[in-house]
Amino acid sequence: MIVLDTSIIIDYFRGVETTYNLIDEESEIAVTTINCSQIIRGDTFQLQAPLSC
């Protein structure tokens, strides 16, 4: 399971695009980053293909 590191989501509710780190829960290593203003706090992803926005 890969989840958003919500600690760095600071500007979502002001509509500011922020870079979100996707963190692998088991290794706690950032596996990729995305920049998507539409992603909401706490969203989770299963990465089966490259993410794009």
UniProtKB/Swiss-Prot annotation:
Q: Which SUPFAM superfamilies match?
A: PIN domain-like
Q: Which InterPro entries match?
A: PIN-like_dom_sf
Under what name is this protein listed? Answer: Uncharacterized protein AF_1480
* Species, as recorded: Archaeoglobus fulgidus (strain ATCC 49558 / DSM 4304 / JCM 9628 / NBRC 100126 / VC-16)
